A protein has these predicted regions:
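Asp-box/BNR beta-propeller blade signature and adjacent active/binding-site loops
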Residues: 19-395
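Sec-dependent N-terminal signal peptides
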Residues: 4-13
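Positively charged n-region of N-terminal signal peptides that target proteins for export
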Residues: 1-4, 202
Length: 395
């Protein structure tokens, strides 16, 4: 994804993180889902099925938005087995790249696959697509029962919210300080285009499903360089847009619910330097969001967030400003105010190290945390990695 204008790079150390890998000896298992190979394999999502199977999806091909052979792939780890199935096709739109798949179950245990088909080989032309089924318990790929596009139409509230939130944001004194007003005005003006604001919304992270059954699917736009959510109150039959999550570069939201009902979004930084995770809060079940503020967590790639069954929050991402050679799992017992426990899952040297990114998290009934992410150690060694962590050991 693009960076816009970067004038100054300020590297601020993220204090308190040990540089050791697996210091708590919490890793139960780590494996490649398929043998590393040369095709680009990226953007995984994992779901635990009711029968105990694990299902993973990712996109794979000769590139990303510019490669029309990119398709959505998947693999299954059947309950009681130790090896993943051979990869199988999950979706392939003829003549278009398919990217950024997300898997989830609604409250009725219907399986959803949501992804983007990239029109015109531009992220801004992406269309949200979905497949659903209840026939997913057998070996191999799910048998899809329905396919459709997810169309959302942000209205005049989109325009007014962008204007109001940018006006509320404090000025900058570094990085984009000179250009921020021009940038803000550019986004305000672009928001008035009804066509542009109706397309180009992309998936990355699984949705948040509230106790009410409401599905909040986080989306982002490479054109507007900000985020939004698609909301469904009928188990995914229909969708409406939230108000935008406004900031200078907050994309790819990951969501978690506080005990008081507030929803917190952590987002990748696609804005000014230094790159830090953005944070926004919704107090009305995802309908509207505060303008984003930067946390002190370094990160310029996709992040994940998950509330564990012991109440702690899990954050996973690259705590770096200069690459993807390190991945950290951080745990919090105060809903993200502080991160007391930190465990490195990947920790290579910058020079000659691998690239690890775009994670997905779930916790299974046995309390184990399952993590999938993209792994590239050379141009001929690309795969999706699966790591199982016993978070009870991280204390």
């Amino acid at each position: 994804m693009k960076q816009l204008i970067i004038l100054v790079i300020v590297l601020i150390p993220f204090s308190g993180i040990s540089q050791k890998k697996n210091s708590y000896n919490s890793i139960v298992k780590e494996e490649f889902i398929f043998t590393p190979q040369s095709e680009h394999s990226h953007g995984s999502s994992i779901v635990a099925l009711p029968n105990g199977d694990l299902l993973v999806t990712w996109f794979q091909g000769s590139g990303e938005r510019n490669a029309d052979d990119v398709r959505i792939m998947g693999a299954r780890l059947e309950k009681g087995k130790s090896e993943w199935s051979k990869p199988f096709l999950m979706a392939d739109t003829p003549g278009l790249p398919d990217c950024n798949p997300v898997l989830f179950l609604n409250n009725k245990n219907k399986l959803f696959l949501v992804w983007i088909a990239v029109q015109g080989n531009r992220w801004e032309g992406s269309i949200l697509r979905t497949r659903t089924t209840t026939d997913y318990k057998k070996s191999g790929a799910p048998v899809w029962e329905w396919q459709d596009n997810i169309l959302i139409k942000p209205g005049d509230e989109f325009v007014s919210e962008i204007e109001n939130q940018f006006d509320k944001m404090p000025g900058l004194h570094h990085g984009w300080a000179e250009y921020a007003p021009l940038y803000d005005d550019m986004i305000k003006e672009a928001s008035k285009n009804q066509v542009l604001r109706s397309i180009g919304w992309m998936t990355r992270i699984k949705p948040l499903i509230l106790s009410s059954g409401r599905i909040i699917l986080p989306l982002y736009s490479d054109g507007y360089n900000l985020s939004i959510c698609a909301i469904s109150d009928d188990d995914g039959e229909s969708w409406k847009p939230s108000k935008p999550i406004v900031g200078r570069g907050p994309i790819q939201p990951a969501l978690a619910v506080r005990k008081n009902g507030d929803i917190v979004a952590y987002m990748r930084d696609s804005g000014d330097s230094p790159a830090r995770v953005h944070k926004s809060i919704s107090k009305d079940n995802g309908e509207s969001w505060s303008y984003t503020v930067k946390t002190d967590i370094p990160n310029e790639a996709s992040v994940e967030l998950y509330v564990l069954n012991d109440g702690r929050w899990a954050f996973f991402g690259n705590d770096l400003n200069d690459g993807r050679y390190r991945l950290v799992l951080m745990l919090s017992d105060d809903e993200g105010e502080t991160w007391k426990w930190k465990e490195y899952i990947e920790n290579d040297d910058k020079q000659g190290g691998g690239s690890y990114s775009y994670p997905s998290l779930i916790q299974t009934d046995d309390r184990l945390l399952h993590i999938t992410y993209s792994s590239r150690t050379s141009e001929t060694e690309k795969s999706i990695k699966h790591v199982v962590v016993d978070t009870d050991k991280i204390r």
